[in-house]
Amino acid sequence: MGTASSGIAIARSLPLRGDGVRRGIPVVAALRGLGYALLVPFIFFICFTFLRPSPYDFFAIPAMALWFCLGIRLHRGAVVFVALLLLYHLGLLLALLPYFEEPRPVEWSYQSAYLMVTAIFFAMFFADDTRRRLELVFKAYVASSLFAACAGIASYFELFGEGLLFRMDGRAAGVFEDPNVLGSFLIPAALYLVHNLVGGRSRVPVLAVAALAVIAAGIFLSFSRGSWAATVIATVTMVWLMHRTSASARLRRRIVALAFVIAAATAIALVAALGDGDIAERFEDRAQVTKEYDQGVTGRFGNQIRGIPMLIERPNGLGPLRWRLTFGLEPHNSYIGGFANGGWLGGFSFLALVLATGFVGFRLCLTPSPFQRQAQIAWPGLFIFLLQALQIDVDHWRHVFLLFGMVWGLEAARLDWLGRLRRSPTLPARNPDNNPAAAGASLARRGADPAAAAAVGA
């Protein structure tokens, strides 16, 4: 009786979480409902990049403003993330100063700052009520990806004629202006569906398989070499993380078996698609490791080699969007772009952000916590984009900033969870997130590493 009473007293003394939670107040409950109602189209319209302004902006600004008013807060686990983002954008601002009279660099810098705000918002938003919010956002992202994939497929086969949807050089683009962005955008949704199928969490597996087939077709018809490779690497990384952290031999066998089934089905679908002459010809052309525009002194890689000595000599870089004026092309490398657009401060801040996020991401995926499953979807998706950043400019991709916010929101939630466990070890075990022993047992049941689960419950 004494333990239960002390547990209840401790529970009452715990600080309110930042989703905040005056659930008994009808007005606040209604505003929270409105906040979630705005969040879904906010995420869904991420794929609408061909309109200026986009429906994304019409929902993003009121959704973020409302949630800020509802009391989401910056947790200590995301402070490093915010600091590095601010340093990166300070570098952009300093590099912009000589070109403040030019509209395009100024507009680009404003867009960068806007995306930074969305990333910080997501890191704050996902730090509380984490699993429920992430599940909602993943579902909205899958819906967005299905729409984008269907639009891409329609654009490839010109189902609605020319002009309505984007098609570039015979490649599907749909609602995106660039097929490479379409292909990459679809990857996190594919990871979510594969993770649920392999992990046995899909409520209606037939629908999940159908959705995955549509998304895979969208990725394939984008004929983006980077997206093809990224899909394979991200999926293998995620499946390896699932297998590595599973303590159940039965679950490990299931993971391996279903991974082979998905791989075999993909191979069969690829062979069938290549039976079409036009698709086979396009595939053969795009399957080359390098294209003509990549090669030579004035090609993509040649420009990068020529540009690096210039960036070493210029602490303020070239200035936002100045690389294209010097070399006639974008850098097609976000790491070089960080130094070109933001100077040494921007470039090194971006590198530090990537390294810090990599450390946090793999720790989230490999360390048992209530948020491990979501991390094993979000981090491989972001990880592959950070690898793609070596061969394409990802610094204005909305979904990259969403995933940055996810990873750091998960880290903030994990640290907050650990802190609550240490402060309140006698809490009742009804919620495993608030009790070390129950949490360890729960993690073990979910397939976490036994030693790590025991350490959590120690």
PLM region spans:
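Membrane-interface helix-loop-helix junctions at transmembrane boundaries of multi-pass membrane enzymes
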Residues: R22-L34, F68-A83, N196-A210, S246-I255, ...
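Long extracytoplasmic/lumenal interhelical loops at the membrane interface
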Residues: E162, F166, Q288-L345, G361-T367
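Alpha-helical transmembrane segments of multi-pass inner-membrane proteins
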Residues: T3, I43, E135-R167, G174-T245, ...
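A membrane-periplasm/extracellular boundary helix in multi-pass inner-membrane enzymes
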Residues: L221, M242-K291, I305-I312, D416, ...
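Aromatic-anchored transmembrane helix interface
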Residues: F81-L93, E102-F126, L136-S145, A149
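N-terminal signal-anchor transmembrane segment
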Residues: G2-R76, Y88-E102, F385, L402
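Loop-to-helix entry and N-terminal half of a specific, functionally important transmembrane alpha helix
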Residues: L34-F42, F362-Q391, M406-E411
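Transmembrane alpha-helices of multi-pass inner-membrane enzymes
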Residues: I61-W67, I377-L386, D393-G440
